[in-house]
């Protein structure tokens, strides 16, 4: 009998950090963070490395990438958050495949993976807008600093405070869900 995959706290924390890095433009930039690390194909590889099953991670990532390959975010609107798909959906799908004894390369395995991806993508959208809403507080603080000509405060407001938003709406949910 095969061992069922379990996700440890350390693995969940690493997945949460990857989720944060892939959603913060200030970290890797949009090109590396959101448009590379946050995509399911790359996220599948990263999840596979963290969870110790690279083959399943890549296959699950491929199945989810097919669903979201043409996803665009015009004007900042988000219909599905691929960061959540990559770092919540893929690990959960990998654990589910393991517990059901399904191969990720099978049709049933791919169907299970994509169902997890679409479910979590919708949840991720809510979390994305939660982050954006909290960031409005920092924006208001930034405008006040500009009005008072306290330009040095802008570094903290622009680069430091958004981490709080991402910890609340990205890191913590990713760790808890995994």
Feature locations, PLM:
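Membrane-interface helix-loop-helix junctions at boundaries between adjacent transmembrane segments
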Residues: 63-122, 141-153
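Helix-loop-helix junctions within the multi-pass membrane cores of secondary transporters/permeases
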Residues: 107-178
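Helix-coil boundary and interhelical linker segments in multi-pass alpha-helical membrane proteins
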Residues: 5-13, 47-58, 94-117, 178
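Hydrophobic residues within the alpha-helical transmembrane core of Major Facilitator Superfamily
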Residues: 17, 53, 88, 123-126
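Small-residue-rich segments of transmembrane alpha-helices in multi-pass membrane proteins
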Residues: 41-51, 87-97, 163-166
